[in-house]
A protein has these predicted regions:
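Sec-dependent N-terminal signal peptides
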Residues: 4-13
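Channel- or pocket-lining gating/hinge segments that regulate access to a cavity or pore
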Residues: 184-303
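Soluble non-transmembrane domains of integral membrane proteins
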Residues: 21-188
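Sec/Tat signal peptide C-region and signal peptidase I cleavage site
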Residues: 15-20
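Juxtamembrane boundary at the C-terminal end of a transmembrane helix
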Residues: 310-319
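Positively charged n-region of N-terminal signal peptides that target proteins for export
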Residues: 1-4, 303
């Protein structure tokens, strides 16, 4: 009798455990077709996108039209939705316009590569209730749409689990952890930076050239040498502030910081070289001053060009 009672208790506990698991898992097949990406805003760390989204599943309670959640979206607008419940399953198709929040990698700006991410899940049913699988058939973005200034490298879709370190106030056996199956899109883009680079750094390079020309101003005009060099110094600082105003704050040292820092250092070296030339002139060593100017000018020009080439090459190809 005791064995029978123990067996009944064991079976009862097993059935209670099964009941606690909730409804049986259902597979949701999700597909996406991106029609537009625009308004990429580096300062606000966001971009806008439009895409078609479709889903196929059997459990009507999932109600993805009302329960769809895009965690990283700043705003979501739904339009042109279709729901078909024939054949014992639900087919949902809708078009979404979203403003997405994202983080940017600006260390190699403007020769940067970015990854735009979209993630979606069901806000009411966790991973114990549904499993999302990507619909990989066909293309995932319209190759005809133009993302001005960028080149689309790839579009990868996948599925996974998003873990929340909370039970959202529910009794979860004391475990403060929730898992939700999600659908992920990762769009890799590369900036077409040729024209943008010269547009941003032309002022800096002109400031360097003006400073470099100071070596060929006659020794009688030392005031002009120092005046042009100091003016170039402020021009480089101003150029950097203009570029920084369009970029998000970053704690890392970027290509923009490197090139401007190099130029500022070179201008300071030129000012120091002019001071040394002035000292030679005051000692009536005009020939030595001219020879020094010619040598230091050549060394500075070669080093500046080589270092610029190296840093730019590293940013563009050494990723």
């Amino acid at each position: 009798m005791k064995k029978i009672i123990c067996l009944c208790l064991l079976m009862t506990g097993h059935f209670i455990h099964l009941f606690a698991q909730g409804i049986k898992k259902d597979t949701v097949y999700v597909g996406i077709y991106i029609t537009s990406i625009h308004d990429i805003d580096f300062k606000q760390k966001e971009f806008a996108t439009s895409f078609w989204l479709w889903m196929r599943y059997r459990n009507h309670e999932f109600d993805f039209y009302n329960n769809l959640e895009i965690p990283s979206a700043k705003s979501i607008e739904k339009s042109f939705f279709t729901i078909d419940t024939s054949g014992g399953q639900v087919y949902l198709q809708m078009k979404l316009q979203c403003v997405m929040k994202d983080s940017w990698r600006i260390s190699n700006f403007p020769f940067d590569e970015q990854k735009l991410r979209i993630s979606l899940e069901n806000s009411q049913f966790d991973a114990n209730s549904l499993v999302i699988m990507p619909d990989t058939a066909g293309a995932h973005f319209d190759r005809r749409f133009t993302l001005r200034g960028w080149k689309i490298d790839s579009c990868i879709i996948s599925s996974g689990k998003r873990v929340y370190e909370t039970a959202f106030g529910l009794a979860n056996g004391g475990k403060q952890l929730s898992e939700y199956s999600n659908f992920r899109v990762r769009l890799s883009i590369t900036r077409d930076a040729g024209g943008l680079f010269w547009k941003m750094f032309l002022g800096m390079y002109l400031a360097f050239l003006i400073t470099f020309i100071c070596f060929y101003i006659h020794a009688d005009s030392m005031d002009s040498r120092f005046g042009l060099s100091v003016g170039s110094l402020f021009a480089v600082v101003g150029n950097k502030y203009i570029i920084d105003s369009s970029l998000p704050e970053s704690s890392s040292f970027t290509l923009v910081d490197t090139l401007h820092g190099l130029t500022l250092f070179v201008i300071l070296v030129v000012i120091a070289a002019n001071a040394h030339s002035l000292r030679l002139i005051k000692k009536d060593k005009f020939k030595e001053a001219i020879k020094f100017d010619n040598k230091i000018a050549l060394v500075i020009l070669i080093l500046y060009v080589l270092l610029n080439f190296w840093f730019i090459w590293q940013a563009k190809y050494g990723k």
